[in-house]
Amino acid sequence: MQFIFKTSVVIFLCVVLGYLHADEVFTHKDWSVTTYDSDPEFIKYSTHGSAVWGHEFGFLKRAGSCDEDNIYVSWSSTVKLDQLKEMEDQKVLFDLHPDEQFFQFAVPNLVVNPLLGSEYLEIPNSLNVMLFTNYFPQVTFSPSLEAGRRISVKVNEKDPHHRNFDIPDDEFSLEGYIAARQFAVEQCEIRTQALKIKNQYKITMR
């Protein structure tokens, strides 16, 4: 089950990194909820960094497991792609401070891809994006976010991969977190029911 989930997440994140077919379906204050036509099982709710807008902190929900929140961290780096690729499938230790509280999570790095420009977006320097996910925080983490106003996310200085991060820390607003999470739950439940109906239809058509 773990392997199947991980494989699905990798496929999904490849789509996310390409910013393909993304549909921002809900926004409240600093948080938004995004769905993907190419992989409708996943719902992402997240916010952007205050130091680097391209840094993203949030969670993934998957249809069929709506009570689970899979942490999602996106980080950019100008370190050479080959060096960053060596970090794939490795865990990176993050220090997280929602207001005065402290948590420490070792989150797997599943995907590293270059951020490519387009006719609408020019990227002058080589920029790579790293995705960290497939980690489900302890149950006390979400209540701390609900009660907080901001969260700082930092790569632990003793982590061997710390050198791969140009900017190893950032702050994220928690304004809008509660509403975004609730909307993500609702979307997840709707999609779960749709999948059940689809699967039942497949069975009856056999």
Language-model features: locations:
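A generic "folded-domain core" signal
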Residues: A22-R206
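Bacterial N-terminal signal peptides that target proteins for export
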Residues: M1-V9
